[in-house]
Amino acid sequence: MTNRKITIAEMIAQKLKVRGVQRMFGVPGGGSSLDLIDATAQHGIEFHLSKREDSAVMMAAVTAEMSGAPGVALTTKGPGTANAVNGVAYASLDRSSVVVFTDGFSPAIKKYVTHQVFDQKALLEPVTKAHGLLESDDPTLEFEELLDQASSPPFGPVHVELISAVARKEILIPEDHKLPKKDKTPNQLMVDEASVLLATANQPVIVVGLEARSLDIAKQIDSLINKLNCPSLVTYKAKGVIADDHPNYVGIFTGGKAEQSCVSQADLIILIGMDPVELILQPWPYNAPVLDISEVNHTPHYSTPNTGLYGPLVKSLEAIEGNAQLSKWVSEEIVMHKSDMITRLTFPVENDLNPQSIVELAQSAAVHNPRATVDAGAHMISATAFWKVSQPNDLLISNGLATMGFAVPAAVAAALEDPERGAIAFTGDGGFMMCASELALAAQTNANIVVIVFNDGALSLIDIKQKSRNLSRRGTTWPRPDFAKVAEGLGCQSWRVDTVEDYKVTLEKAFKVKGPALIDVVVDPQGYGEQLTSLRG
């Protein structure tokens, strides 16, 4: 034990640096957040001032998803914590390892103060894995345990409520404070059962989910697919785990209608890293046996797996691959199912400038292979179906929470994490209006992003549902703003287009910009309803 003393804020900075944290996001107040910003700066951790707290947590979460290190966000107490909730819910339901620091109120102050005071722990408790005050006898161990909880499957946020007095408190720190790591191995009985299912299946289908978003897992999945030669699908967040140009790739799995013609022919459905948080609100439609290979046993689940292998995915896949045999699928059938999926999701309105062409033309013009970030809304169907990717996290989306206001902050975070590739954000006008202010951070950091706004003057998905119930059109539309002017005011180069010719020319300009750019695309929403029905039923 060393006699050297450091503050708890300094200890936090040290531990974050050891875990690989390079940047954090937030909106500080006058308390512990200032101590954290100062302490982390001494360890080379950059602080980025977001414009909203929920965006800050989303940026931290996306950083975690891309880097593998915990994401870090901080807020002030009271309104800062309240504003952060949607971002914390994203980290929770989209399974991102995030540490959320909020300031707090000391017991002495709570005796007489009610201004901004509420139970912050209780507010965030439903969407956090753990809470800590770092007031125990060993705050270093307490913080290490919180970090481990955030980084243990299912990944998620932890809440550190830190008052100024605690942040500045001096402590003795051990020379080495490592926690033992648990090394899980697959249950042999379950491996044997899974092996029997694999060996006896003639027409298996693989469905890959968000837990599989790493290169080593993707490689192991590819090996299994090649052995089985079977149709393979991914959830939205797993897009890229199987490359779009892979001969066995069929398309997106949502739990809806579009994939049923393929999956209904399976005599074994193999779920790999598939967290049911990603599926739509419909009952499981398949009768085939289910083999669930996942980091954890998720409950409740849409299906009732016949066998489950729970633990590290690579080890589970290695344990069963030797029993995989060439299926009776023929390659032409798999190609047919992929073609059928594309036909179902093709935008049904013949207009040169439509959601599908907006996405496809953007990819043709993109010169640095940017990552795509996709907001919730009707445009996401075209964005996820027709933006082609080849690696995990090439496309970033909120699918557990499915929140709007995600694509722009996610693009900023992605560009900061990987400046060379940068990012392209596909967002509806409704979602963009929720987070447009983050373009100021993009301009401040000269983030390599291009934002494509689908400007249709409506909450199109809700508009579709309203019409389907034969209700009057109320509360779902607005006059179309000029988002190019908004972006210009926030420091970005921007254009507004309403023809495909102008869009093509503008894309070339946007991808040449050294910094953030935005294209406000006036688009006709007709066709979204038919496309949605084809996808979900």
Pin down the residues of each PLM region.
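Phosphate/pyrophosphate-binding active-site segments
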Residues: M1-R4, L134, E161-L162, I173-E175, ...
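N-terminal alpha/beta PP-like core and its mobile active-site loop of ThDP/TPP-dependent enzymes
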Residues: T2-Q325, L361, A365-H368, N448-V451, ...
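Active-site diphosphate/adenylate-binding microenvironment
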Residues: A9, R19-Q22, V27-T40, H337-A414, ...
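Active-site nucleophile and cofactor-binding loops and adjacent substrate-binding regions
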Residues: V27-G29, H48-M58, A73-G80, D375-A376, ...
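Hydrophobic "anchor" residues on beta-strands that sit immediately upstream
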Residues: V99, R371, I424-A425
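Thiamine diphosphate
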Residues: I109-Q116, H301, Y310, I381-G537
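Active-site-proximal structural scaffolding
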Residues: I225, C262-V263, P355, C435, ...
